[in-house]
Amino acid sequence: MSSIQKTPVVTCFLTRNDSGELHILIARRSERVGSYNARWAGVSGFVEAGVSPDEQAFTEIREETGLQRDQVRMLRRGAVVEYEDASLGRHWFIHPYLFETLAPDAIQHDWEATEMRWIAPAELSNFETVPKLAEAYESAVNGEKT
């Protein structure tokens, strides 16, 4: 019997306001990432040992979008969303965040994504996403203000 590995990750929802309408950034995961290839996700990554989820969130944003800390603002920190994927042998602990993007035109995706799109949050259900992405978004939106 295989053991299930507890795996903390961050998922960051970057937002921008387009003429009064809120949009969130989603990224299509490349074939080069370790799981859920070609699925849509927020900006996400493993929480490294000795690093807080808050710090990891800023690191993932910088690595995956090129945005620096002064180009985003953390708005909310959601409650952890859990998901067990026996096929991967992982029990995910998803730390969701909501960020305001101060420089959306500066975003450049890295190798982890094949494309990125700004969508209305209501459109999320139209995409094949990583597990629990909608729940993570709801948690982030309803999370504590930072």
What is each of the regions a protein language model found here?
Residues 21-63:
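Conserved Nudix-box catalytic region and its N-terminal flanking loop in Nudix hydrolases
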